[in-house]
A protein has these predicted regions:
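A structural motif
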Residues: 26-28, 164, 231
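A short helix-to-beta-strand connector/capping loop
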Residues: 60-63, 89, 108, 165, ...
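SAM-dependent Rossmann-like transferase core, predominantly class I methyltransferases
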Residues: 73-141
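Conserved SAM/SAH cofactor-binding pocket of Class I
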Residues: 118, 122-199, 203
Length: 274
């Protein structure tokens, strides 16, 4: 048994709540649809109760949750239901435990191997796919990249494979350190990847590209540092389309120059006005 959490929600809110749990690092989420019209979600965000409480309070302030011992012995069964992710025709993300493609990739395609472990970032979530698409469009040889809320490191590692000179990941989850380093090593870019639990204030020089696939409250909380550190481009995701005006206002004077919407989730490319 593992220390987990239980959230009672509604059919109307279950998708949003689940997506936010995935973004917080859930690896497996069970759903129990009850006859009284409620939906019970069970998952685990780790054994640090103080950290879990702060994450829930910040990202899901309106939900009621309780501690509950849960059986995650079958958690890895989700791996049986994922497949290689086509980001673009030339960029694919392969779960590390899959040896062959469910769909053929072009012979010259870039294929990133990722094992997220207990972190967020396999490449299949709409926010990750949108971030990867925009990242692929702006990475130039020699670029420097900051991946805020890096999780598995899929965004920063992909940037390095695509030609970035150096990438730094930040996260508040200690598991991101080991997992992202392992993924960087698996893709041959460990020497150019650094990951830190330190706040953004410690970074002095801006990066060519900053990518932040995190939820709206955190984007707003970090907006000053995101603006400061984005030398050329800022990619933000983790917000539902049509509900991101407050995020963009917080990021002014940066302006949106491109937007991708996948399954209702918006990913934006911002830059400084000319």
């Amino acid at each position: 048994m593992t220390r987990g959490l239980r959230i009672d929600t509604t059919p109307e809110e279950v998708e949003v709540v689940s997506d936010r749990l995935w973004a917080l690092g859930a690896v497996a989420i069970s759903e129990e649809w009850r006859s009284d019209g409620t939906v019970v979600l069970r998952t685990s965000l780790g054994d640090d109760r103080d950290l879990v409480a702060s994450l829930i309070a910040r990202e899901l302030p309106d939900v009621v949750w309780v501690d509950e011992d849960i059986d995650l012995s079958v958690a890895d069964t989700w791996k049986e239901h994922v497949s290689i992710v086509e980001v673009t025709g030339d960029l694919w993300v392969r779960p590390a435990w899959i040896d062959t493609f469910d769909a053929p990739a072009p012979p010259n395609a870039t294929v990133i191997s990722i094992d997220p472990g207990p972190t967020f970032g396999l490449g299949d979530h709409p926010t990750t796919r949108g971030s990867l698409q925009l990242l692929a469009s702006v990475i130039a040889p020699g670029s420097t990249v900051l991946d805020v809320g890096c999780g598995s490191g899929v965004l920063g590692v992909t940037a390095l494979v695509l030609g970035a000179h150096r990438a730094v990941g930040t996260d508040i989850t200690p598991a991101a350190i080991e997992i992202s380093r392992a993924n960087a090593a698996a893709n041959g870019v460990a020497d150019r990847w650094r990951v830190s639990l330190e706040p953004l204030e410690v970074f002095g020089e801006p990066f060519d590209v900053v990518v932040a696939n995190i939820l709206a409250p955190t984007l707003i909380e970090l907006s000053e540092q995101l603006r400061r550190l984005a030398g050329r481009y800022l990619i933000v995701s983790g917000v539902l389309d049509g509900h991101d005006d407050h995020v963009h206002r917080a990021l002014e004077p940066l302006v949106e120059v491109q937007r991708i919407v996948i399954d209702g989730w918006a990913t934006s490319l911002l830059t400084r006005p000319e």
